[in-house]
């Protein structure tokens, strides 16, 4: 693989591939040749530093890395997360074909379908008012208490599908900072509130701390006996859940082969189902399943996850671009960049390959972003004129959900396409001078000001266009990015499905808590940590 990476670098230089503006000038059919479509989902990668030679090399790279073979190993339930000895089967959760998926000799689909059925019955009971609070009043507000994958996915998707909400209001509490749950509880009435505690082990410190506060909120207002009517759990720790006061009929489980950042398709998606209904949740699963089948069957130049992953690797390891910006032109996708940040950086933020040796070159990029057009008035300046090249990934729907505001959606589309074009085209010094002179500026001043109005252009971007952000379309989009992360992980040569980097800070925080509380001294702490503890204590701890 190293030889192909070096060949890619030399090909980029020899073919002037980074002159994207020039490539469009010389090839009027570039868009047709470097875009691909899956149903209504269009991926335009023509504004990236690629050509036919580079795409052929990237395809060879994927072949040599064994992407297709490792993809099938994942779908077939092999323990590709070898550091934890686990299969990776979030795809089974959305297997709408219901074909057998075998793990350790057992078809998991009956269990998957049983949990989905139980979720549906509970969600519809809440939505229809047959499942009520302890006083008999209908539940109007549902609070999901979780963190990481137990929060980011359902929070993102629930906001994204706001036009489909016809159930209780949804709230999400994740941060152990007491302000988060305190601000949420101020909005709620105990009699009409249900809390979902999402923690596989029922030991996650942030989640269980917030859950205890929520429990006290219910118990103090309605009594201890009311707790069970105002809580549900997504967990496998049945004894701990029972000790908390939640009945087994309100516990929804999932499996070790579902990683947290891939768990929106599982019972972790219960808040989304409550908001949009079981039928729309199944449509969400169906969209992801459609992308799964596309990923498994489409040839490389038509395979959106393969293309996105290969180009992402090209940006990171051939062109050495350190970050990527996720720029959805949809306010309801405002949490999508944060969701992808966890999905990508927790998966591919690794420094060791599968064989235990250091990664050669780079692993995953920094992933960040905000919705357009907000970002245009914040950080796009750096993307356009900064010294680092930042690949951008735009997404825009052809239709919104507010027909009476069609003119605003037209403006949104125009801005999205304009930003993509501006990053590619830029503005030369001569063009900048000409514009200033045309405005009436004298030559000397124009010569002085023009360099500040130069845009180098040739800034790469990918644009996704789709009809409308329906449950099906959202499921398809999330699955596309999941598989992109998988492809890049294979090319990096790493295990994308563990997250040992999350654990060290947890371990240290557990040891530091008694120090912060003044129950233990700072002996054994480094000087900086000891000094910070002392400073906080002096400020009134």
Curated annotation (Swiss-Prot):
Predominant location category: cytoplasm
EC numbers for this chain: 5.3.1.9
SUPFAM superfamilies in the record: SIS domain
GO MF, one example: carbohydrate derivative binding
Top-rank EC class of the record's enzyme: isomerase
CDD domains per the UniProt record, alphabetical: SIS_PGI_1, SIS_PGI_2
GO biological process: gluconeogenesis; glucose 6-phosphate metabolic process; glycolytic process
Catalytic activity from the UniProt record: alpha-D-glucose 6-phosphate = beta-D-fructose 6-phosphate
Disulfide bonding pattern of the chain: none
PROSITE patterns in alphabetical order: P_GLUCOSE_ISOMERASE_1 (PS00765), P_GLUCOSE_ISOMERASE_2 (PS00174), P_GLUCOSE_ISOMERASE_3 (PS51463)
Active site residues of this protein: 346, 377, 506
Alphabetical UniProt keywords: Cytoplasm, Gluconeogenesis, Glycolysis, Isomerase
GO cellular component terms, semicolon-separated: cytosol
Similarity-based family: Belongs to the GPI family.
Reported function: Catalyzes the reversible isomerization of glucose-6-phosphate to fructose-6-phosphate.
Protein name: Glucose-6-phosphate isomerase
Native species: Allorhizobium ampelinum (strain ATCC BAA-846 / DSM 112012 / S4)
